[in-house]
Swiss-Prot record:
Propeptide residue range(s): 1
Protein name: Thrombin-like enzyme agkihpin-1
Species this protein is from: Gloydius halys
Family, per entry: Belongs to the peptidase S1 family. Snake venom subfamily.
Keyword Protease applies: yes
Example of a GO biological process term: proteolysis
GO CC terms in record: extracellular region; extracellular space; extraorganismal space
Enzyme class: hydrolase
Protein purpose: Thrombin-like enzyme that shows fibrinogenolytic activity against bovine fibrinogen alpha and beta chains, but not gamma chain. Hydrolyzes fibrin. Enhances ADP-induced human platelet aggregation. Has arginine esterase activity for TAMe (tosyl-arginine methyl ester) substrate. Reduces thrombin-induced thrombosis. Does not have hemorrhagic activity. Reduces the motility of human liver cancer HepG2 cells in a wound-healing assay.
Keywords of this entry: Disulfide bond, Fibrinogenolytic toxin, Fibrinolytic toxin, Glycoprotein, Hemostasis impairing toxin, Hydrolase, Platelet aggregation activating toxin, Protease, Secreted, Serine protease, Toxin
Amino acid sequence: MILGDDECNINEHRFLVALYTSRTLFCGGTLINQEWVLTAAHCNMEDIQIKLGMHSKKVPNEDEQKRVPKEKFFCLSSKNYTLWDKDIMLIRLDSPVKNSAHIAPLSLPSSPPSVGSVCRTIGWGRISSTKETYPDVPHCVNINLLEYEMCRAPYPEFELPATSRTLCAGILEGGKDTCVGDSGGPLICNGQFQGIASWGDDPCAQPHKPAAYTKVFDHLDWIENIIAGNTDASCPP
């Protein structure tokens, strides 16, 4: 869920993809070139269908396209990930897509993000912190990039490490957040694709409980190696 937000403009999320299983939209993802989508490892399911160029779930765009995964790549062959590490998955589409009015890739970041940046996150996730209410069109919200400790301190039960390849983002006073169904979607800071929605509190958007995002910049070498055909590439330790 994107909470405390507004409906996205139909033209501002050409890179956003929707992951379906059967008829259920369960995660988002980001098109990074004509053949590859980046999302969260915990979004891995059997029989994924990928919709590109989608805005309304009820009224299709003329240029919507559907794909299925040709290959999936994880940091570890075991597909393991934790709350603080390796929640990232690369999906190779079964055939390339063409740019269109509502489809275009989002570039990988050229520099790391800075704490204090205003970031935008996008998704079709729940729009109520307590009710199973899902929107027809994706919602967008601006949140702040925070110190990692801001995500570590509120969750002592998770025993998160002192350092992490995870970004922390949210609004400390609460009210704005990603939520159930937004996993795998992008966090865009100062125009750059910096994070993949990973996990947060439930109920969402609670004060002093921001959410965590996989840090894309730290995984650039792995992403670029996999795309180049070096399928034995390893993620950063």
